[in-house]
């Protein structure tokens, strides 16, 4: 809804709600896509919530690696839940509206979870570096207080950045149109309907996005560089395989997540095309949160064994 307010005989349109156009406007695709994304979201919730519960209940998973994995699942569950329910509504209603304040709220929470995940992934890489390169000091370096610092600092920092960017964005003026050709609340599609000059805001977003991505990615790359050197120096083939296998799941997630974000957020505005942005956004906002727990569980014997123990001991399910 747009309200027209008159100031000194000048009509100014005040946007009070937005219309999210969704992934597609093809009527024939609405029902199939609703079913597909509903299944994806349910698998995401079950997988990530299950990982959180499993790493909490099973004492053998009370290690730094699974501590970080629990928080990775929390962030995955967080930003997918911010997006998916509202997106699913868009498939079954004629006009999917979202209020001005609720758009800002969803955007803020989405940014909190996304930025937090970047630094949790880098903390997981550092954890693998310490485990492989400094095994005798692992318990000392990765003490419980250190673990909490490595997750609380990203949560606090991401909250600050999210609030700063959201407040900065919503202080600007919007044009008459309130239609956003996107399927979730993000800052890039919203900037297309701003009346104000967006150069400063684009620069701020580019700086924050670039610094967050490159700083966290540099931690990952440096950690894996040392890990690779340590693995190549191992005499035992079995030892090299075991060391690499402990990193393979995390490395797979890192490549998918960082690759997509670098593709989306470090492009200049002129290079963005709506169709490609939507496809890339679907991948990292909906598919990656679904795939992460599957990657960590299917390729991890400890997780599979813990699941068997939990189902057998707590729920009396014979396996």
UniProtKB/Swiss-Prot annotation:
Residues passing through the membrane, by range: 32-52, 61-81, 106-126, 146-166, 204-223, 244-264, 278-298
Cell compartments where the protein resides: Cell membrane
Keywords of the record: Cell membrane, G-protein coupled receptor, Glycoprotein, Membrane, Olfaction, Receptor, Sensory transduction, Transducer, Transmembrane, Transmembrane helix
A single GO molecular function term of this UniProt record: G protein-coupled receptor activity
A GO-annotated cellular component: plasma membrane
One Pfam family hit: 7tm_4
InterPro entries per UniProt: GPCR_Rhodpsn, GPCR_Rhodpsn_7TM, Olfact_rcpt
Cytoplasmic topological segments: 53-60, 127-145, 224-243, 299-319
Family: Belongs to the G-protein coupled receptor 1 family.
Descriptive protein name: Olfactory receptor 8K1
The species this protein was found in: Homo sapiens
Name of the gene this protein is made from: OR8K1
């Amino acid at each position: 809804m747009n309200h027209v307010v008159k100031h000194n005989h000048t009509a100014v349109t005040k946007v009070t709600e937005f219309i999210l156009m969704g992934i597609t406007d093809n009527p024939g695709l609405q029902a199939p896509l609703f079913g597909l994304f509903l299944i994806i979201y349910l698998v995401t919730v079950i997988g990530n919530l299950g990982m959180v519960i499993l790493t909490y209940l099973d004492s053998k998973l009370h290690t730094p690696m699974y501590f970080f994995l629990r928080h990775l699942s929390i962030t995955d569950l967080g930003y997918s839940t911010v997006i998916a329910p509202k997106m699913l509504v868009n498939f079954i209603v004629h006009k999917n509206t979202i209020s001005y304040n609720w758009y800002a709220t969803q955007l803020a929470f989405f940014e909190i979870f996304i930025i937090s995940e970047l630094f949790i992934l880098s903390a997981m890489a550092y954890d693998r570096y310490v485990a492989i390169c400094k095994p005798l000091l692992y318990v000392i370096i990765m003490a419980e207080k250190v673990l909490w610092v490595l997750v609380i600092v990203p949560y606090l920092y991401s909250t600050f950045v999210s609030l700063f960017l959201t407040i900065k964005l919503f202080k600007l003026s919007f044009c008459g149109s309130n239609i956003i050709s996107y399927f979730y609340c993000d800052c890039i599609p919203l900037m297309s309907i701003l009346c104000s000059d967006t150069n400063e805001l684009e620069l701020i977003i580019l700086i924050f996005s670039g610094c967050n991505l490159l700083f966290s990615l540099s931690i990952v790359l440096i950690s894996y560089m040392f890990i690779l050197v340590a693995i190549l120096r191992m005499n035992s083939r079995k030892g090299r395989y075991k060391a690499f296998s402990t990193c393979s799941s995390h490395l797979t997630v890192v490549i998918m997540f960082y690759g997509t974000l670098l593709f989306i957020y470090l492009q200049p505005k002129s290079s963005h095309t709506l169709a490609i942005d939507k496809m890339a956004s679907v991948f990292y906002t909906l598919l990656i949160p679904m795939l992460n727990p599957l990657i960590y569980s299917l390729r991890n014997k400890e997780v599979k064994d813990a699941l068997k123990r939990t189902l057998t001991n707590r729920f009396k399910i014979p396996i």
